[in-house]
C-alpha cells in the first residue's frame, strides 16, 4: 500500500487512502454548536479532519478510535493548520490493511539489537550478565520489547521506539559513566531495564494507549515489580540482594523527582547518570520531531509558527549552516 506522507500534503491535494482512526472528539462551542473531529493516522504521522457539524455528524456516528477506515477527501487549511475535508469515509474489515503500515515505526531494528547484545556480551560480571539474560535471552520478552513504543504520544512514540530509546540512553549513559568513573556495566543494566514496565503499561496493537494497570500504577512501579518477579522466579538467585537493590533503585528513580514520576530520587552515581541520559534521549527526540515536521512552520520560516507541546512552551529553530564545509 502506498503511504501518503501527511507532513508534506499540499492544500488542495485530494486523497483516497486507508487510515487508522487515532482519536474521535466531540467538541462543544456553546448551545447546540457541537462538532465531531477525527484524528487520522498512518505511518508518516497524523492529520485532523475538518469538523463535522450538526446533522453531518451522523456520517461518522459509527466511527470509533482504533478502527481502520477508507477515506476520500481534500486537504484544506484553517487558521494556518492543515485539515482533511472528508467527502467519504467507510470502515474497513479487520485484517484488510496491515496495521504496521498505519503506525509510526523506527523501521529496521537490527542495528539496535546488534548494539544492545554487543554491550551485554561485554559485561564483565557474570552475575550482571545473568540478570540481563533473564530478560534479553527470553524470546517473548524480545518480541514485545522490539514492538513497544516508548510513549503513546511524545518521545519515541512509534513501533520499536522503546528499543531505540534504551539504546540511546545506554550510549549516552555509558559515556558519562566512563568520564565520571562510574560503573559502566551497572549503568548499562539500568539503561536497558529502566523502562521494562512499559511492556505492561501500553498497548500497541492499533492505537497506542495505556492499559488499565498502566494508568493505575505507571511504568516505574510496573518495571520494579517485573524486575522483582523475574529474579524471584530464578533459582538459584542470579545475583546478591544488594546488587539487585542497585538496579531496582535505578528503575525506581530514573525520573529524577517524585513530581515527575520517580518513586525515590537518585542516590547513586549510576542512578543520577541514568536520569540525565534518559532525559537527554527523550528531549532530543522531541526536539528533532518538532524540527522535522514542516507543519510546525509557515512556508520557509526557520522558527516554529507555534509553541509545540513537546517543547514545553518553547519555539523551535531549524536554521542550519554548512560552516564552509564543501559538499
Q: Predicted segments — roles?
A:
Residues 267-327:
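Acidic, carboxylate-rich catalytic segments that either coordinate divalent cations
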Residues 19, 66, 169, 278:
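Divalent metal-coordination and catalytic microenvironments
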Residues 153-155, 164, 174-294:
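Divalent metal-dependent catalytic cores for phosphoryl transfer on phosphate-bearing substrates
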Residues 37-42, 204:
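Short, acidic/hydrophobic/Gly-rich beta-strand patch recurrent on exposed beta strands
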Residues 24-34, 46-50, 54-102:
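OB-fold single-stranded nucleic acid-binding module
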